[in-house]
A protein has these predicted regions:
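Metal-dependent phosphohydrolase cores
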Residues: 1-129
């Protein structure tokens, strides 16, 4: 995402309520989430919705559901949402980008799971293989 677009997004979020912020970020995922990552047959939008749905079905808190929905927002903020697989070779730490960006607008109960999701996934992959 280009710097001017990020600044425009920040301006919208700064003057928005928590519900409006969530809606604005959902629009970003809806607009930019049409590409797929890795070798999966699923788009970023589908992945975000699946994660949030699983969290809801497991009776997680609203904050955890929000984290589940926005956990890969960093891919979009760093421009890794353009069907390029460059990020597989050049880690831009999308989890830290998203957590840092969202920390201005959401509590730690939302941003901490986002920050930790990559490390958690790597751990699970290592013990389940």
């Amino acid at each position: 995402m280009q710097l001017d677009k990020i600044q425009s997004l920040e301006n919208k979020l700064n003057s928005a309520s928590i519900i409006e912020r969530t809606n604005v970020l959902c629009e970003i995922i809806d607009q930019r989430g049409s590409c797929s990552f890795y070798d999966e047959e699923i788009t970023q939008l589908q992945h975000a919705l699946q994660c949030a749905t699983l969290a809801k079905e497991n009776n997680e808190s609203d904050k955890f559901i929000t984290a589940s929905l926005f956990h890969d927002l960093g891919h979009m903020l760093t421009g890794e949402d353009v069907n390029s697989h460059d990020f597989l070779n050049n880690d831009k730490y999308h989890e830290n980008v998203a957590a840092s960006f969202l920390s201005k607008y959401f509590p730690e109960e939302v941003t901490y799971p986002i920050k930790m999701h990559v490390i958690a996934k790597r751990y699970l992959c290592s013990v389940q293989s």
